UniProtKB/Swiss-Prot annotation:
Subcellular location: Cytoplasm
UniProt keyword Cytoplasm present: yes
Classification of source organism: Bacteria, Bacillati, Bacillota, Bacilli, Lactobacillales
Protein's recorded name: Regulatory protein RecX
GO terms of biological process kind: regulation of DNA repair
Alphabetical UniProt keywords: Cytoplasm
NCBIfam families xref list: PRK14135.1 (NF010733)
């Protein structure tokens, strides 16, 4: 068999064999196998050309994908599969890219962890879950995260949350709110407690009393439609306690209110 036609098509070349079979190859394939019109090919040579063309095309696609930003190994695999690169060729492409340091999950995660340390707002658990979803190996993730201490990030996030909620909640509810928000962002319970302790929250008794009376009025409007007397006081007490107000402060305020 021989090549009867070679035609450039954007990034690829169309190679026609015996005016019957055709395939698309990269420029690297043309150069590597010195493909020219009328060149004779054996069956084995043609198979080698097809495999290398897939490899070369897949690698070019991967490099294009990586050029926009760093990618995990799984992201590159999925991208190649999506673009219909032969599944048997994909591992070769990945190995080649890793050998040339185009793909390096460890360094990528190190970079992302450092970014989070400098300007992010996530704890280690949130980062780990995100990276696992990206297909990174648990062992690699754990090795990277052991290098970083995100306690300062937790303090920064706590300070920001404090500006949002302080003065709007009693101290106990405020602390609970802060801890829940921090846990949701991937910090451990202990990291969350330590961050709050670092900021040394102080109760504003005058403000808390004002909040309590305001809440009593609100809850009274709700429960007085169904209850009165002792039952009303019980429901008010339970509701206010669940909202983080001190039991003694509730009892004192209700005595004044009634």
């Amino acid at each position: 068999m021989k090549i009867t036609k070679i035609e450039k098509k954007k990034r690829l070349y169309l190679v026609e064999i015996d005016k019957k079979e055709s395939l698309y190859v990269t420029e690297d394939t043309i150069v590597k196998y010195m493909l020219t019109k009328e060149k004779a090919l054996s069956k084995d040579q043609l198979e080698d050309i097809k495999n290398f063309a897939q490899f070369s095309h897949g690698k070019n696609l991967a490099l294009y994908f990586i050029s926009f930003k760093q990618r995990t190994e799984k992201e590159v695999r999925d991208y190649l599969f999506k673009h219909e690169i032969n599944p048997h060729i994909i591992p070769q492409i990945i190995d080649n890219l890793k050998k040339d340091h185009w793909i390096d999950d460890y360094k990528l995660l190190e970079s992302l962890a450092q970014q989070n340390l400098n300007s992010g707002d996530k704890g280690a658990y949130a980062l780990k879950q995100k990276w696992l979803q990206k297909g990174c190996e648990k062992q690699v993730i754990d090795e990277v995260l052991t290098q970083f201490d995100f306690s300062e990030v937790a303090i920064k996030v706590t300070s920001k949350l404090l500006r949002k909620y302080q003065g709007k909640l009693p101290t106990k509810s405020l602390k609970d709110k802060l801890i829940q928000n921090l846990i949701n962002k991937g910090f451990s319970f202990q990291e969350s407690k330590n961050a709050i302790n670092q900021l040394e929250l102080e109760a504003d008794e005058e403000n808390e009393q004002a909040l309590l009376y305001k809440e009593i009025e609100k809850q009274y409007q709700k429960f007085s439609k169904k209850y009165d007397g002792y039952e009303l006081k019980q429901h008010l007490t339970q509701s206010l306690f669940r909202k983080g107000y001190d039991f003694d402060a509730i009892a004192s305020a209700l005595r004044e209110y009634f």
